[in-house]
């Protein structure tokens, strides 16, 4: 019995040490900002820096679907969800049901400025002083 406890303790201890020695996962996913080559850099170095900087900016600003922290947003009935009230006229999916547009889309029947005033209360179910 004591041998089993020792083995379990050693397994737990080795697992903890292995986890502590790993680099943090966030550091592996974040790209490093390219280093400026200086004012006396050759055109090739500046072109390489510009390409690396463009790649860096694209990595930082790319859309991350499902990866955002949604503390301040709703997980349901967001503006532009299939449950919002703006149908796409004439466009139907395979099941024959209407597709829906994002709030304020250029193809929607209501101008964008109307959505900036009314989209959030409608999505929250609080339109006209409701719930």
UniProtKB/Swiss-Prot annotation:
One of its GO biological process terms is:
neuropeptide signaling pathway
Secreted listed as a keyword: yes
Where, subcellularly, is it found?
A: Secreted
Q: Which domain of life is it from?
A: Eukaryota
List of residues that carry Tyrosine amide: 65
Chief localization: secreted
Q: Read off the PROSITE patterns from this record.
A: PANCREATIC_HORMONE_1 (PS00265), PANCREATIC_HORMONE_2 (PS50276)
Stated name of the protein: Pancreatic polypeptide prohormone
Species of provenance:
Bos taurus (Bovine)
């Amino acid at each position: 019995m004591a041998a089993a406890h020792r083995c379990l303790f050693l397994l737990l201890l080795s697992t903890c040490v292995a986890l502590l020695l790993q680099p943090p996962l966030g550091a592996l996913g974040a790209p490093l900002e390219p280093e400026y080559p200086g004012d006396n850099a050759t055109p090739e170095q500046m072109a390489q820096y510009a390409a690396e900087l463009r790649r860096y900016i694209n990595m930082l600003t790319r859309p991350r679907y499902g990866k955002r922290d949604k503390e301040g947003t709703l997980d349901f009935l967001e503006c532009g969800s299939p449950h919002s009230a703006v149908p796409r006229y004439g466009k139907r999916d395979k099941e024959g049901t209407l597709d829906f547009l994002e709030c304020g889309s250029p193809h929607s029947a209501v101008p964008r400025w109307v959505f900036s005033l009314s989209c959030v209360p409608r999505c929250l179910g609080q339109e006209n002083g409701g719930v």
